[in-house]
Amino acid sequence: MKEAQDALRTTGIPAFALAWRSTAAYPTAPDQYIVYTTMTTESEHWDDALCQYQIYVYLNLWSKGDPTGAARSILQAMRSGGFALVEESDSFEEETEYFCISSTWLLRKEADSDGT
């Protein structure tokens, strides 16, 4: 979703939709990167017409080092983009030695007059 891409771009942290994949720019996983997916649902109808929908962003921040600063940057960027934090959790992957901060974000948008 464009709204998520635009918000995450301001962090300066490499962000990948769905999964990190090797590219010419990133032949190996960066020390810090974001992977995200989105889901859109219809949330409000008036007289059988769509009035509002919700965009959920499921985001994972992966970091070899302390992820605190990057997590703050993401929080500021997503809030500036109009998203609200729904939940957040953290973990550590011993095999890869990456910290992972998983979060769910929500953006409510008014539907256009044609229902899109």
Predicted regions and their residues:
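Acidic-leaning, charged glycine-interspersed low-complexity segments
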Residues: 72-116
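Oligomerization/assembly interface segments of phage tail-like spikes and tubes
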Residues: 51-65, 99-109
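Generic structural motif
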Residues: 23, 39-41, 64, 108-112
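Small/polar-rich, solvent-exposed N-terminal microdomains that initiate assembly or binding
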Residues: 1-47
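Short, solvent-exposed beta-strand/turn "edge" segments of beta-rich domains on protein surfaces
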Residues: 46-50, 94-96
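Compact nucleic-acid interaction/catalytic patches
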Residues: 68
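Generic signal for short, ordered secondary-structure residues
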Residues: 38, 56-57, 84
